[in-house]
């Protein structure tokens, strides 16, 4: 996922091993099942160590064992609350990427590549004569 650090610097956040991530979410469908009444949210928590320098909160990530518990409506509330305990974030990595990720026109693989140019002065124009 992407998070923005002020002023307008996007960061790409992923698992170090490149594996997919599952995020806890909630979905609500109105009793009459009208599409306009549907809503969904991603559950967030305080950011793990280090990631807080980029943004103060992050999605609640679910591992394979907690994913099944999250999806089980009979799971006790205490078990769900235990999933929100602090993590060390060691399985995550994050780095700056191009500001192009904020444009709906940009859609290419390179958007997740590291880009450390933010805040640097543009290259000086070569002298014409």
What are the residue ranges of the model-derived segments?
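A structured binding-face within diverse protein domains that lines the active/interaction site
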Residues: 1-129
């Amino acid at each position: 996922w992407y998070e923005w650090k002020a002023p307008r610097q996007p960061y790409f956040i992923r698992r170090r091993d490149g594996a997919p991530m599952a995020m806890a979410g909630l979905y609500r469908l109105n009793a009459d099942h009208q599409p306009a009444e549907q809503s969904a949210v991603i559950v967030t928590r305080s950011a793990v160590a280090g990631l807080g320098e980029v943004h103060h909160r992050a999605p609640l990530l679910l591992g394979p064992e907690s994913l099944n518990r999250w999806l089980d409506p009979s799971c006790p509330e205490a078990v769900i609350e235990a999933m929100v305990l602090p993590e060390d974030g060691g399985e995550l990595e994050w780095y700056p990427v191009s500001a192009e990720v904020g444009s709906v026109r940009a859609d290419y693989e390179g958007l997740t590549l590291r880009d450390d140019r933010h805040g640097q002065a543009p290259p000086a124009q070569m002298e014409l004569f």
